[in-house]
Amino acid sequence: MIFFRAVGRCVRMVGMFVAAGTELAVKQPETRQERADWLHRFCARAMRGMGIEINVSGSFPKRGVVISNHLSYLDIVVYAAIHPCVFVSKAEVAGWPVVGWMTTMSGTVYVARGHGGSAMKAREGMQAAVDAGLPVVFFPEGTTSNGSGLLKFHSGLLAQPLDGGAPVTAACIRYGFAEDNGPDVSVADDVCYWGERNMLGHIFTFLGLRGVRAEVRFAEEPIEFSSDTLHRKEAAVEARAAVATLRLGNTIVGEERVPR
């Protein structure tokens, strides 16, 4: 049954990509806002197509920077489905199946590790998005995990909001099942994507799951940093603590649901 469900959803997703590509070709969005709006519409449809429910606690900030833990390629789709935004991602994401095309077309700011000028270009891209009135989302862990804890937060991308004065809001994402998928299925292995796993195989398995639920919690207020640009490592510690606090909250029940 899982296999046939996955095949059916794959076919449905192909149709969605064709429709999204056609929309891009016809409307040719030029501004950051138009591209963010396109991604928002596409991701909202994708969530419905995959049968994923999103529960949200708090409000997606209308401007500034959002920092979050990172569990899967799905994180980008979930955040974009909630509200139009711009992402900052590692350059490798551009080569990911499905997600890479989606993020590139929407104007994601990519960071190439080990390239000195890449971080500066990323900061400029972040500032341009903030100036355009769009929230910027990035994942300071720099990679995904199985959700058992928080990895170290990297400090490089915090320079832009610390320098530019943009508010930084902490967020936390996690996943669960509203339906039983059997004893051999777990969120850590079959929803979270981490380690050296084959992405296409993981996506196919994921598409066969039932009752996947994404839960996103936003902090009520932006982080009040005690550190400045010259002490970004301390700021990264403070940012990590803010996200860790959100992770300690109870499972979201009866909160706002993103319309399906």
List the model feature ranges, each with a label:
Residues 1-55, 101-106:
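A transmembrane-helix-recognition feature enriched in membrane-embedded lipid enzymes
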Residues 99-100, 148-230, 250-256:
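A cross-family acyltransferase "interaction/gating" segment
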Residues 18-25, 29, 48-49, 62-116:
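Catalytic core of membrane glycerolipid acyltransferases/transacylases, capturing the structured
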